């Protein structure tokens, strides 16, 4: 918003400078008009041909003044248009600079995120390798537990069989001793 007010103030200041500059020359135009009027009155008295030439010059002078005013107006409009264009260019350059900085920032962020993804992928690979190793170890341990359970079961069965056998032998020995003691 301040750029618009600065721009408007700048235009008004330039127009004031131009108007002051033209006002300096207005006394010359007035002096010229007075001289031309004096010349006309002198010429009318002395010579009618000079009067025609004077009128011609006066018309030409008036036409030149009108042309000058038209050119001045056109110059002012062109100056205003040029200043608007300059302002727009400056705004676009600022916007472009901001966008370039934002783009650079986003590119840096993308690079950092890509590096982070690479590191996370490495970590995931390591975790997958460790998980696979743990699964292998678990399978080996489960196999060992199964084998040891089977072996333990067989040992218990063998021990029970041996205990049965020993108990039967003991029973037989006790029966024998009892039968010997009875006799």
Curated annotation (Swiss-Prot):
Coiled-coil intervals: 44-183
Q: Does the keyword Membrane apply?
A: yes
Domain of life, per UniProt, equals Eukaryota
Record's keyword annotation contains Transport: yes
Quote the subcellular location field of this record.
Preautophagosomal structure membrane
Q: Which GO terms describe its cellular component?
A: phagophore assembly site membrane
The membrane-topology field of this record reads:
Peripheral membrane protein
Which keywords describe this protein according to UniProt? Autophagy, Coiled coil, Membrane, Protein transport, Transport
- Swiss-Prot/TrEMBL GO biological process terms: autophagy; protein transport
Gene3D superfamilies per the UniProt record, alphabetical:
1.20.5.170
Assembly with partners or alone: Homodimer. Part of the ATG5-ATG12/ATG16 complex. Several units of each may be present in this complex.
Q: Which family does it belong to?
A: Belongs to the ATG16 family.
What function does the entry list? Answer: Stabilizes the ATG5-ATG12 conjugate which is necessary for autophagy. The ATG5-ATG12/ATG16 complex is required for efficient promotion of ATG8-conjugation to phosphatidylethanolamine and ATG8 localization to the pre-autophagosomal structure (PAS). Also recruits ATG3 to the PAS. Involved in endoplasmic reticulum-specific autophagic process and is essential for the survival of cells subjected to severe ER stress.
Name the chain's protein: Autophagy protein 16
Source species: Debaryomyces hansenii (strain ATCC 36239 / CBS 767 / BCRC 21394 / JCM 1990 / NBRC 0083 / IGC 2968) (Yeast)
């Amino acid at each position: 918003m301040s750029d618009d007010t600065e721009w408007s103030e700048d235009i008004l200041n330039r127009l004031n400078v131009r108007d002051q500059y033209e006002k300096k020359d207005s006394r010359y135009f007035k002096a010229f008009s007075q001289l031309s009027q004096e010349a006309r009155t002198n010429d009318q008295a002395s010579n009618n041909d000079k009067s025609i030439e004077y009128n011609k010059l006066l018309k030409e002078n008036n036409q030149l003044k009108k042309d000058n005013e038209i050119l001045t107006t056109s110059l002012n409009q062109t100056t205003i248009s040029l200043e608007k264009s300059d302002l727009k260019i400056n705004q676009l350059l600022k916007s472009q600079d901001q966008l370039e900085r934002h783009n650079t920032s986003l590119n840096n962020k993308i690079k950092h995120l890509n590096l982070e993804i690479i590191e996370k992928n490495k970590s995931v690979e390591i975790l997958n390798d460790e998980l696979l190793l743990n699964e292998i170890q678990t399978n080996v341990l489960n196999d060992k537990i199964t084998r040891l359970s089977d072996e333990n079961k067989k040992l218990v069965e063998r021990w029970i069989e041996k205990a049965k056998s020993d108990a039967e032998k003991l029973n037989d020995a006790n029966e024998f001793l009892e039968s010997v003691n009875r006799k």
